Amino acid sequence: MKITALELFHISIPFAKPYKLSRVYGTRYDAEAVILKVHTDEGIVGLGEADPLNPFSEETPATVMVVTRDHLAPQLIGQNPTRISAIESNLDVMVHGNLLARGAVNMALFDIVGKANNLPAHMLLGGLYQDKVPLLGPIGSGTPEEDAEFIGELIESGYKTVMIKMGALPIRAEIQRMIAAHEKFDGQIKIIVDANQGWTVAETLEFFDGIGSRRPALLEQPIDRHDISGLKRIYQRAPCLLSADEGVASIQEAAALIRAQAVDAFSIKVSKNGGLSKARKIAATADAFGLKILMNSMLEFGITQAASLQLGCVLPNLLNMGHAYMSVLRMSDDITDFDQNISRATVTVPSQAGLGVRLNEEKLKKYTKDYLKIK
């Protein structure tokens, strides 16, 4: 089998409602992605997805398309797509960085190999550890009253974990949000606080002091991704689990955080981490040192969500809480059928070959802003 061509589709789809994040990311009204098709001479087509989010990463939809055209495609066309490790090793030498573009390719290769052997991708990653995973429900920045309304709706829908976005408001306001949510819903739902790099070390410590015993189950990436020493200071004072997200894109960053003993968990995002192969290495390294994994998401569509699920279901070190397999639910539409796997705040691992997701060609055409084919 050989790779014969690549197709790239830059898509944009609005959110169902505006998504308020931290002061770093602002309010988001739509999500963009680059959808990848990798064609083979046997007629098997592998699907991948890159999910750029500025300033989360330096990559944009335009850079993903250019890097794929100019640097990745020349290393892929004519190659045997089943030799995933060899391709990964070659691209590590030939293409530095660009993990989002690399991730789309890696997803597509696993999709091809799974389809060629009539196996779901999780069978290529170690086999099922769990066949169902609970979802977390995300809540954007808002008031305590808005939080209470959204959390109540999530509980009615079966959610047991909520991720509250913070980092946009003054720290005293964020403290009040945490206290209000804990006092109203304690015992009914686990609370994750995600500050998305929106705080300083001092603000984070003030948050800990202010909430007292009304602590979340987990705090994610409160400060700048590069400040490992600051994160360690927070870790030493944290009354809850602490996870890194923006600060753990590569295996080298994961190793640095482990050496520093700065976190309890890593937030895995298959697109951010450069695909299934690299994300699997990060998760395995975390497990070896006793760290847990939160399967999180960028502003993703169904292909990345499907790839993430294929990985998450094989990991023995997932956190005992909800995980971010609800990304397509916050969109006004999706270009796949991934949502059919979701019921009552739980996602069931599909048994179909490859990534286990189907592309809706009409919707792909509808939402495409730019297109590129490389032979």
Feature map (PLM): residue ranges:
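Metal- or metallocofactor-binding catalytic centers and their adjacent structured scaffolds
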Residues: 5, 39-116
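Structured beta-strand/loop patches that form or line metal/cofactor-binding pockets in enzymes
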Residues: 1-47, 51-56, 328-333
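Metal-dependent enolase-superfamily TIM-barrel catalytic cores that perform enediolate-based chemistry
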Residues: 126-238
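Shared catalytic-loop signature of beta/alpha-barrel
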Residues: 215-218, 226-241, 248-346
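Glycine-rich, aromatic-flanked loop segments that form ligand/cofactor-binding clefts
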Residues: 106-140
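C-terminal extensions of enzymes
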Residues: 330-375
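Conserved, mostly hydrophobic/aromatic
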Residues: 3, 36, 43, 72, ...
